[in-house]
Design a protein with these regions (language model features):
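Specific alpha-helical transmembrane segments that line the substrate/conduction pathway
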Residues: 46-57, 84, 92-125, 164
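Membrane-helix interface linkers and caps
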Residues: 61-79
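Membrane-interface helix caps and helix-loop-helix hairpins in membrane proteins
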Residues: 93-98, 146-154, 176-177, 203-208
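Hydrophobic transmembrane alpha-helices of multi-pass small-molecule transport proteins
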Residues: 59, 63, 84, 126-146, ...
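Helix-capping/transition residues at the boundaries of transmembrane alpha-helices
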Residues: 37-39, 95-97, 123, 175-179
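Loop-to-transmembrane alpha-helix entry segments
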Residues: 73, 104-108, 120-143, 151-158
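Glycine-/small-residue-enriched transmembrane alpha-helix faces in small-molecule transporters
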Residues: 2-49, 82, 86-90, 139, ...
Length: 208
């Protein structure tokens, strides 16, 4: 019994540190995206394509080094790559009019609410923490997006970020059924690369 508490505490601290590191990485992602677009160093199309390309290359190399294969023809790629492309496109273009903090708030709120809603509709009983998280996320979104509120939000930018949040939530939910997380993720990025590039090209390619 004496050894159980330190082990449980160590597990909690490990989870806390990994979660904090993940959230910092997500926040840095928003900041770097906004800086790249606002400074003119890249347009949304170029930034999105570079992100997908980098992910595809790194993940594909990891799969090959482990002796795995890329399941590119799996039906799972329809939802996986499609939702990933939706996230990448909406996320990058939205930062033309949204600042980093506001964009991240909308994105994380929508992801939380979407995953909670899907879980509720599929019969999964929500936990107290899930209910609390969804309530906080919904309250934050309502405060930010309320038409008569004090925060001025570009409607198109907000809509694009909402779409990105739905895409990321769908991608996360679809990933739960992947038999091999690394191979499935790598395949999603590889398939999403031409989809993202083509969609942005058709949409205009360059934004001012």
């Amino acid at each position: 019994m004496c050894k159980a508490r330190p082990t449980r505490y160590a597990g909690f601290m490990r989870l806390f540190l990994l979660t904090s590191l993940t959230m910092c990485a997500f926040a840095a992602n928003s900041i770097l995206n906004r800086l790249a677009i606002e400074s003119g160093a890249s347009d949304p199309a170029g930034f999105a394509v570079v992100r997908v390309l980098a992910g595809a290359v790194v993940l594909a190399v990891l799969v090959l080094l482990k002796g795995g294969v890329l399941p590119l023809r799996s039906p799972r790629r329809i939802i996986g790559a499609g939702s990933l492309s939706l996230y990448m496109i909406g996320f990058s273009v939205a930062y033309l009019t949204l600042d980093a903090g506001l964009g991240a708030l909308i994105l994380f709120g929508v992801v939380q609410i979407t995953m909670f809603a899907v879980g509720a509709m599929t019969g999964a009983a929500p936990t107290v923490r899930q209910l609390a998280g969804a309530t906080v996320a919904l309250g934050g979104l309502a405060y930010v997006l309320w038409p008569a509120g004090t925060v001025q939000v570009d409607a198109l930018g907000a809509a694009l970020m909402v779409a990105a949040g739905v895409g990321w939530a769908a991608y996360s939910l679809a990933g739960r059924s992947e038999p091999n997380a690394l191979e499935g993720t790598a395949a999603n990025f590889v398939v999403a690369l031409p989809v993202t590039a083509l969609a942005l090209l058709v949409a205009g390619g360059t934004w001012q």
